[in-house]
């Protein structure tokens, strides 16, 4: 499950409700779930109802690459409708082979997954036809009363691939039922969400050499949502929503003479049908986005190279005002022995995005979720200074950044409206530092991270006694992932996180937390295709609330086996 794989990634903050695979928001650099985008190949994936559902990507991890986290200028050029950052996946090359896994744990947890890939021995034009299929299943009663979840996912893909490029035709279907106390609201009720997500993608990428490439794609997505605020009460009744998205995108890098031209374009058409989100001005919207940023380089003395990039991004919809956002980056590469960093860079990137329908079309004057049809385009300016380096088995990155956002749509709580959560625009400045070090060895892997954040917020005339999202952030966060290959087939993985959260009136369990997960695996030396695992999540049984007022999942264990062929 793609979101679960990000749980202890130092560049990403996963805010889970129950297990990450049940429901989780993904935040980057102190942003919120609505300011995080997702890409698969050349297309930007999106749910127009709410950013909660943009992370519902019905694709097996075996079909996707490891994610790249885009921030700053990279996000401004390669992201879409995401002012903080983008999780970018590529389509993995199919290989002949497969795997099957099954596991069980406490709270009547069981899970299973299967994958099979085939590559045809017959080729044409230097490329071969391949196909793969996958399925995943998971059920649990949950670690809290009325905390059950059910998950099903099925995938099929055709691929034509060779040394020069790759074409993928993918279909995914996913169903997910989640129930949890205070799933989205702080009113001590049992809420549930029942989702059905379909995704059809056609993507092509052609490698041109020297770092140049061209990629293009198109997709269709449908998400059906059945939300119940109070499972144990008669009112209010359920809410039903269906969204459709049709999108196309292209991106690339082409070198002509001394200039390399970085470009991208996206078109997305969305539609909402809902029995409650009916108070806005529209329920369809067309989005257009294009970016162009040429870059050039100069060789300097001492094995150094200076690269300058400058360009702009154009965003428009048929419902909102358009915006032109400048992007610039200056990078100094240093290949001299003994240099502290392989690259030093400074960048400035402006970006913009528009609100989703839950914020725009919820009833403004009554109800549990209060919307505002007048919410406008959200704008951000990001300035960043950073470095990258690698020596021997170590690699590291460091960045200091400042993001100034105007009109960010947050959901707030006010004692003057104790029975509602309200969509409100906020002007917010975020200053942060981000440090990551990675070590890869024969017996040991380490991933160490630190993030420090500070925010200054202005809600204008809105009465905001607490923020569900924009002011739910760690002032300090340390992560440490340790993988030990102990020999004779044994491997131990420890994922750890320590955080000091910004105080929040809605969080009732404290603002400091130490969270850990451990997995022990064994591969018999004479049967390397088999892997046995035992894992514990929330090892210290912490009650820290990732999302304010949402109870934490308790300690859970699972044991299983994976067979590969």
List each language-model region with its residue ranges.
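C-terminal beta-signal and adjacent terminal beta-strands/loops
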Residues: 501, 520-565
């Amino acid at each position: 499950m793609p979101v679960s794989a990000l749980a202890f990634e130092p560049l990403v903050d996963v805010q889970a409700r129950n297990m990450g695979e049940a429901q989780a928001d993904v935040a980057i650099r102190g942003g919120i779930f609505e300011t995080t985008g997702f890409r698969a190949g050349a297309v930007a994936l999106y749910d127009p109802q709410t950013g909660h559902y943009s992370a519902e990507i019905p694709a097996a991890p075996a079909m996707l690459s490891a994610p790249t986290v885009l921030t700053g200028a990279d996000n401004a050029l390669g992201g879409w409708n995401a002012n903080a950052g983008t999780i970018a996946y590529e389509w993995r090359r199919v290989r002949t082979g497969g795997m099957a896994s099954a596991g069980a744990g406490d709270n009547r947890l069981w899970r299973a997954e299967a994958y099979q890939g085939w590559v045809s021995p017959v080729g044409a034009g230097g490329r071969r036809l391949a196909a793969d299929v996958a399925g995943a299943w998971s059920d649990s009663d949950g670690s809290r009363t009325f905390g059950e979840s059910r998950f099903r996912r099925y995938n099929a893909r055709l691929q034509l691939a060779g040394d020069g490029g790759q074409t993928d035709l993918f279909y995914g279907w996913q169903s997910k039922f989640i129930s949890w106390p205070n799933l989205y609201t702080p009113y001590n009720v049992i809420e549930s969400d029942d989702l059905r997500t379909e995704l059809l993608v056609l993507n092509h990428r052609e490698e041109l050499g020297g770092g140049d490439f061209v990629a293009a794609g198109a997709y269709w997505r449908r998400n059906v949502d059945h939300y119940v605020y109070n499972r144990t009460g008669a009112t209010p009744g359920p809410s039903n929503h269906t969204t459709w998205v049709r999108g196309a995108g292209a991106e690339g890098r082409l070198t002509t003479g001394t200039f390399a031209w970085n470009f991208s374009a996206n078109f997305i058409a969305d539609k909402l049908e809902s029995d409650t989100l009916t108070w806005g001005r529209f329920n369809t919207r067309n989005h257009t986005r294009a970016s162009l940023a040429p870059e050039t380089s100069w060789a300097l003395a001492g094995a150094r190279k200076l690269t300058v990039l400058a360009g702009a991004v154009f965003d428009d919809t048929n419902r909102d005002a358009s915006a032109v956002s400048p992007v610039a980056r200056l990078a100094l590469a240093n290949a001299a022995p003994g240099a502290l960093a392989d690259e030093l860079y400074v960048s400035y990137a402006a970006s913009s995005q528009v609100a989703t329908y839950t914020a725009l079309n919820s009833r403004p004057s009554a109800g549990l979720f209060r919307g505002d049809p007048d919410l406008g385009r959200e704008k951000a300016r990001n300035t960043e200074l950073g470095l990258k380096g690698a020596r021997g088995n170590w690699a590291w990155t460091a960045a200091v950044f400042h993001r100034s956002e105007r009109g960010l749509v947050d959901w707030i709580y006010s004692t003057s409206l104790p029975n509602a959560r309200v969509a409100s625009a906020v002007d917010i400045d975020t200053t942060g530092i981000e440090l990551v070090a990675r070590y890869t060895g024969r017996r040991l892997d380490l991933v160490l991270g630190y993030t420090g954040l500070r925010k200054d917020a202005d809600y204008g005339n809105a009465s905001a006694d607490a923020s569900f999202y924009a002011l739910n952030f760690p002032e300090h966060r340390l992560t440490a992932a340790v993988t030990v290959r102990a020999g004779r087939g044994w491997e131990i993985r420890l994922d750890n996180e320590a955080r000091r959260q910004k105080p929040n009136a809605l969080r009732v369990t404290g603002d400091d937390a130490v969270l850990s997960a451990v997995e022990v695996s064994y591969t018999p030396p004479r049967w390397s295709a088999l892997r046995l695992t035992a894992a514990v999540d929330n090892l210290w049984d912490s009650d820290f609330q990732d999302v304010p007022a949402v109870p934490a999942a308790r300690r859970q264990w699972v044991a299983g086996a994976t067979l590969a062929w």
